[in-house]
């Protein structure tokens, strides 16, 4: 039986960038990896309502730089940057090194697989019909300019006795084409009937030229708390 490879892992180094950007020798590697995991777990739990898309961690010269991609930067930054400062202190305690936090806004959350899957899971937990939640997400993504989107849910759908899987797709989602810019994410909805898994694939178009093109196009709008306040005025 054919199995599907992880779309993001398959494209790493071709058109996708890593979420942890650092190099460590054998002695330090495990510690760095463990602290990265703890930082991500802490941020996802603390900023649960901030619509976090992804977290990039870099380690320049005995320090750590965390870039948070979010659809709601105001919640992360807080009043006069107070929340960012609290986060910085907490992460410094976890990692034991100086921390710099940057915030990057996700302009189109409808085209971000992580945010779409989280949106569907939150709807399922609020007892919205799964077909309605799927269809709404697909229509919103296509309206915002996606070339294609596929959403799959699996589990005890609608409280059925036997778990099953259903999916809905619009446009094209070429999983075998390595230059295809496909965003993929998975989330879990914890309902009274059990856990329902949600998978989302979003095809945004093809990237020609590999990582060089990605570096050029994907320069994030990284903002410190001062820059963010300045831009809002």
From Swiss-Prot:
PROSITE patterns: KH_TYPE_2, RIBOSOMAL_S3. InterPro entries: KH_dom (IPR004087), KH_dom-like_a/b (IPR015946), KH_dom_type_2 (IPR004044), KH_sf_prok-type (IPR009019), Ribosomal_S3_C_sf (IPR036419), Ribosomal_uS3_bac-typ (IPR005704), Ribosomal_uS3_C (IPR001351), Ribosomal_uS3_CS (IPR018280). SMART domains: KH. It holds the Pfam family KH_2. Residues 39-107 form the KH type-2 domain. Keywords: Ribonucleoprotein, Ribosomal protein, RNA-binding, rRNA-binding. This is Small ribosomal subunit protein uS3. Binds the lower part of the 30S subunit head. Binds mRNA in the 70S ribosome, positioning it for translation. GO terms for biological process: translation. The keyword Lipoprotein does not apply. The keyword RNA-binding applies. Part of the 30S ribosomal subunit. Forms a tight complex with proteins S10 and S14. GO terms for molecular function: mRNA binding; rRNA binding; structural constituent of ribosome. Gene3D superfamilies: 3.30.300.20, Ribosomal protein S3, C-terminal domain. GO terms for cellular component: cytosolic small ribosomal subunit. It comes from Buchnera aphidicola subsp. Acyrthosiphon pisum (strain 5A). Belongs to the universal ribosomal protein uS3 family.
């Amino acid at each position: 039986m054919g199995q599907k490879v992880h779309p993001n892992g398959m494209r790493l180094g071709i058109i996708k960038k890593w979420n942890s950007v650092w190099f460590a020798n054998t002695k330090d590697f495990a510690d760095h990896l463990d602290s990265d995991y703890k930082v991500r777990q802490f941020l996802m739990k603390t900023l649960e309502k901030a619509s976090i898309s992804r977290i990039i961690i870099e380690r320049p010269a005995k320090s750590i730089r965390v870039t948070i991609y979010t659809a709601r930067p105001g919640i992360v930054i807080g009043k006069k940057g107070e929340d960012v400062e609290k986060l910085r202190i907490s992460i410094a305690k976890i990692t034991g090194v100086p921390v710099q936090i940057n915030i990057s806004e996700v302009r189109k959350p409808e085209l971000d697989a992580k945010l779409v899957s989280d949106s569907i899971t939150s709807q399922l937990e609020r007892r919205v019909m799964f077909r309605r939640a799927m269809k709404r997400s697909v229509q919103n993504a296509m309206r915002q300019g996606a070339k294609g989107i596929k959403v799959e849910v699996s589990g005890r759908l609608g409280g059925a006795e036997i778990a099953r899987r259903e999916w809905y797709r619009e446009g094209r989602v070429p999983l075998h084409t390595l230059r295809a810019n496909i965003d993929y994410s998975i989330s879990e909805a914890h309902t009274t009937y059990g856990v329902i898994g949600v998978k989302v694939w979003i095809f945004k178009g093809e990237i020609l030229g590999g990582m060089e093109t990605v570096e050029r196009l994907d320069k994030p709008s990284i903002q410190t708390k001062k820059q963010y306040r300045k831009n809002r005025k």
